[in-house]
Amino acid sequence: MKKIYVSGNGNVSWEKFQQFYIEPLKKFNLDECEFIIGDFSGIDTLMMEFLKDKTEKLTILHVGKRPRYFANSFKTKAEKWKVIGGFTSNYERDIFGIDLCTHFLAVDFNTDEKRKSGTLKNIEKCFALNKIKV
C-alpha cells in the first residue's frame, strides 16, 4: 500500500493542479493508495474533490478542533475518510503526515529569494527521509 502525502500551495490554478497532481497519479492504481492531506484551500481542497468518489482511504490532518474544509460526503466515499486534528501548528501537522507516508506528491509554486514556502519545506523533509516522489 502506497501512503501518499499530498502538499501544495493555496493559490494553484486548475491547469497546474491537473498537470502536476492528477497526471502523476494516473500511473497508479488508486485502490493501492492511501492519501494523507491537509485541509487548506488550494491543493488540499482540490484533491479532496478529486478523490471523494474514488477512494475511502484518505486521512485529513488539521490544526485545531475541526477541518477548515471537508468534501461533501453524501453518497461519496468521503463518508469513510478519517480526520485527525488537534495539531497546534502547520509544522506539527506536516511532520505527522510526512512520518506516516511512503510517497509524496508536492510541487512548490511560491518560493522566491525572500521566502521559502511551507510546501518547499515539506518537499525537503520528504527527500531527507527518503520518501518516494510521485
Where are the language model's segments positioned?
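Short, hydrophobic/glycine-enriched beta-strand segments
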Residues: 2-10, 37-38
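Short, Lys/Arg-enriched, disordered terminal segments
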Residues: 1-2, 134
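Acidic/glycine-enriched connector segments
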Residues: 12-134
